[in-house]
UniProtKB/Swiss-Prot annotation:
SUPFAM superfamilies: L-aspartase-like. It comes from the Bacteria. The keyword Cytoplasm applies. GO terms for molecular function: fumarate hydratase activity. Its main location: cytoplasm. Substrate binds at residues 99-101, 130-133, 140-142, 188, 320, 325-327. This is Fumarate hydratase class II.
């Protein structure tokens, strides 16, 4: 009969672990003592850990600290994790030690046991690969976890959020160009204002997302600084003098991103301003997306009793009781994502402020919330673009009706009859239920021909020289 469990040991003693699991005693202890919630460490973070463990093995070998055969086993096991294998062997919750020590050891143990399996050894024997002595060589949880945080953050921004945000920006720009010739009434304070084109309105959305993309680039330099090499408190104890610089170069080589060794490891371990700054950028992007989504659902409200200027794609039934009802569901999903991102940023900001002396011990909750925001925004932008923006259509007759009946067209008369007289025209038209033109003529302020020459909505969308 095959044993269902094996014995794993750590400095506190021995524990039984399921025979088919690659983790060891420290991971098992974490499962026992931190059964809190259902949030586990993100796969992106585990992959980042595997990258840094591979880079550390290569660097330690190059510096003469790790034998080539051991380095090769670690590299092979790490490569499998980088490729997406063994993710079910990383079960630990976010809610653990604030340095992420249990997750660092989870990675060390899985890589060590997988390396042992590759060479035909006995799982749990720590021979020929020891999780601490070999996989964790020249490292501490205190510098590996923040390093993995930055690797995961940069990779997520570059491969997920930037492409998704750029695609949404480009689709909005296509609509801006398509709608350039459609003049509509503007609105401020949710009230009628002077005209602009629908293309101009959409160009504002494009500019907001351009600003978001620019802000992402502003936050990347801080995220490209790595804590690895600081070891326990930032001094680099038990690492080679060249380790920090060389391992950062190796990580840059492996990822294709320009990572460097953080110039001050004490700050890199005890503070997380770079992630807090980047989270602030995500919050700013969420603010832009909230505005865009709200505008589109307001302009698409109706179909008969709302603004109805835009026809939003009808993707699914909107009500379980009202037949034929269709709702702006993509806008609603987007706005919920935005408020979640804002909440995540509040958590990150507070957690980043909680460093004490040489270490911040809120690391897992910081990266959990950051990657959550990043993925939500990436997915929401893709969904919003595909299922709403691409299929947007304009109800031009509705747009024209609002434009033609707006009292705020009277603003064009200011240079000709003065602000006070123009206000009188608007109030008279509203009170008597007549047109601006009729009110102005009845008040004796101008002729019909003058009104037609001066009040031309299409000429009110840009500055005009006197």
């Amino acid at each position: 009969m095959v044993n269902s469990h094996r014995l794993e040991t750590d400095s506190m003693g021995s524990l039984e672990v399921q025979a088919d699991r690659l983790w060891g005693a420290q991971t098992q202890r974490s499962l026992m003592f931190f059964d809190i919630g259902s949030d586990v460490m993100p796969p992106d973070l585990i992959r980042a850990f595997a990258i840094l463990k591979k880079a550390a093995a290569i660097t330690n070998q190059d510096l003469g600290k790790l034998p080539a055969d051991k380095a090769e086993l670690i590299i092979t096991a790490a490569d499998e994790i980088i490729a997406g294998q063994w993710l079910d062997h990383f079960p630990l919750r976010i809610w653990q030690t604030g340095s992420g020590t249990q997750t660092n050891m989870n990675v060390n143990e899985v890589i060590a046991n997988r390396a042992i399996a590759i060479c035909g050894g006995e799982l749990g024997s720590k021979n020929p690969i020891h999780p601490n002595d070999h996989v964790n060589m020249s490292q501490s949880s205190n510098d590996t976890f923040p390093t993995a945080m930055h690797i995961a953050a940069v990779a997520g921004l570059q491969t997920k959020l930037i492409p998704s945000l750029q695609a949404l920006r480009d689709s909005l720009n296509e609509k801006a160009e398509c709608f350039a010739g459609i003049t509509k009434i503007g609105r401020t304070h949710l009230m009628d204002a002077v005209p602009l084109t629908l293309g101009q309105e959409f160009s504002g959305y494009v500019a907001q997302l351009d600003q978001g993309l620019t802000q992402i680039n502003y936050c990347l330099p801080g995220l490209l600084e790595l804590a690895l090499g600081g070891t326990a408190v930032g001094t680099g104890l038990n690492s080679h003098p060249q380790f920090a610089k060389k391992v950062a170069e190796e990580i840059a080589q492996l990822t294709g991103y320009t990572f460097i060794s953080a110039p001050n490891k004490f700050a890199a371990l005890a503070g997380h301003e770079a992630i807090a700054f980047a989270s602030g950028v995500l919050k700013s992007i969420a603010a832009s997306l909230m505005k865009i989504a709200n505008d589109l659902r307001w302009m698409g409200s109706g179909p008969r009793c709302g603004l109805g200027e835009l026809a939003l794609p009808a993707n699914e039934p909107g009500s379980s009781i009202m037949p034929g009802k269709v709702n702006p569901t993509q806008c609603e999903a987007m706005t919920m994502v935005c408020v979640q991102v804002m909440g995540n940023d509040a958590t990150i900001g507070f957690a980043a402020s909680q460093g004490n002396f040489e270490l911040n011990v809120f690391k897992p909750v910081i990266i959990h919330n950051f990657l959550h925001s990043l993925h939500l925004l990436s997915d929401a932008c893709a969904s919003f673009r595909q299922h709403l923006v691409v299929g947007l259509q304009v109800n031009e007759s509705k747009v024209k009706d609002f434009l033609d009946t707006s009292l705020m067209l009277v603003t064009a008369l200011n240079p000709h009859i003065g602000y006070d007289n123009a206000a009188l025209v608007a109030k008279t038209a509203f009170a008597q239920g007549i047109t601006l033109k009729q009110a102005a003529v009845d008040l004796g302020l101008l002729t019909p021909a003058q009104f037609d020459a001066w009040v031309v909505p299409e000429q009110m969308i840009a500055p005009i020289a006197d």
